[in-house]
Amino acid sequence: MAFKSGFVALIGRPNVGKSTLMNYLVGKKISIISPKPQTTRNSIKGILTLEDAQIIFIDTPGVHPPKNKLGEYMVKVSEKTLKEVDLILYIVEAIDNGIGPWDEAIIERLKEVETPKILVLNKSDLASKENIEILKSIFSTKLNFESIVDIAAINGYNCDLLLDKIKELLPEGPKYYLDDMTTDVRESFIVAEIIREKILLNLSEEVPHGVGIAIERFAERENKDILDIEATIYCEKDSHKAIIIGKGGQMLKKIGMQAREELEMIFGIKVNLQLWVKVKKNWRDDISAMKMLGYNLKEV
């Protein structure tokens, strides 16, 4: 049997479960998960290597109207990804009542792309069979899909079937990455994303989306028993800084504790995490600040 390989983009409106699905399929946390929209800011690759295939999943930023240069960057990243992959997984919620404005916009964008597509109805464990069939019919009138699969990424229901459908549609090709690689992003990027996830989970309103993380230090001690990490949380307003720090520093301490615990699980070593908070006004409209915070504008 010929070996297959290829790049698979995950697209869908915010919070339909793109990151949850990629993390489940890869078997490791690669992309951050939050109930808030616009959680993913970069195209993040998750790599799954099987005996007969290597699948590189790309979790694209959620499609949304841009409000600043960071938003424009996110849209460009998503558009560029769709043009370069071998297959697109268009993810919607099986509990939807129909096609809303978000999905109408995505459908119009996908009509411009000839790449093969699979419709993925996520959260099918929460939906009736009748609703699933209705959605299949509605979406099929809008786009041509090579396959339609209903899944539940949270518990893996039908994910094996989805993998089989993906492999069927991928071309024959080489292994692009080593067998033990599950992502191509730097460790410092993963650290920044975990910290940002904890901010998203603990804070509300506009504060989390005005936050950027700079990793100042990432180094193992000589005896390799402790990983020292120093990071600066940048926000856009003094009032946001006060919220992130919290009364008596309690919120920052909580964010740091949650991030440290997860980082220790990921790296398998004790982590000494130090966090600072600084204000950099309007950084999401500042190209130099965006570059400093790790957004590779050259790619788009």
Curated annotation (Swiss-Prot):
CDD domains: Era, KH-II_Era. Residues 122-125 are annotated as: G4. Residues 12-19 are annotated as: G1. GTP binds at residues 12-19, 59-63, 122-125. InterPro entries: G_ERA_dom, GTP-bd, GTPase_Era-like, KH_dom-like_a/b, KH_dom_type_2, KH_sf_prok-type, P-loop_NTPase, Small_GTP-bd. Keywords: Cell membrane, Cytoplasm, GTP-binding, Membrane, Nucleotide-binding, Ribosome biogenesis, RNA-binding, rRNA-binding. Residues 195-281 form the KH type-2 domain. Monomer. PANTHER family: GTPASE ERA (PTHR42698), GTPASE ERA, MITOCHONDRIAL (PTHR42698:SF1). This is GTPase Era.
